[in-house]
Each structure stands twice: as C-alpha cells, then as structure tokens.
Amino acid sequence: MTAMLILGVDPGLNRCGWGLVLSEGSRLSHVAHGVITPSAQQQLASRLHDVFEGICAVIEEHKPDEAAVEETFVNSNARAALILGQARGVALAAAARRGLQVAEYAPTTIKKAVVGSG
C-alpha cells in the first residue's frame, strides 16, 4: 500500500484555506491545515502574490505528492467570481511550479464528500 500526501486548497483572496491529508489505502488522516490571509489594505496584485507565496511555502515545507483545488463557484456577483478565479489561478500556478499533478473539484462535490449532502 502506497501512502500519498495530498494538499487541498480552498482558494480565496481574503482567506485561502489549505489542508494536508495522508491517504493510505482507504484511510485518510489529517496532517496539517492553515489559512493564508493577505492584508485587505494591499492592492490586488500584492494579495495574489501573498497567496502564491503562501501556497509555495506549504508545498516546500510538506512536500505533497498531489494537490486538489476547488473550482470557482459562479453566482450573481461576477466581480467576486473573477477575483476568486484569480486566486484559484495562483493556487494552480503554485502547484504547477512545484510539478504537482492537480485535481479540480466543484464546491458541491467537496461538500457532499465531507458532510454527506450538498
């Protein structure tokens, strides 16, 4: 049975959540988690840079085998969806920079997996 360390990212510009789980067969165990919180006083480019650097630091420290990033949820606020998409883009770029394979999941799929309904 091969163990695999997986980094999950819930992208956001105000708060970007991340978590690491170790997958061993059908068993998952928590390894670490955290939140990257760029200053709201910074300009957009600086905040995106903080998210990118934060995810790169997590990858450097924990050396995950793969990553999973939540897809953007599009609602009636197009501007918010575009900004979230940019945060998601830097999360994908950080994983790609480290050569990680990235799986992408819809928010409803993640919610169903975690709480049983979506």
Model feature map: region roles:
Residues 1-118:
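Phosphate- and other anionic-substrate recognition elements at nucleic-acid/protein interfaces
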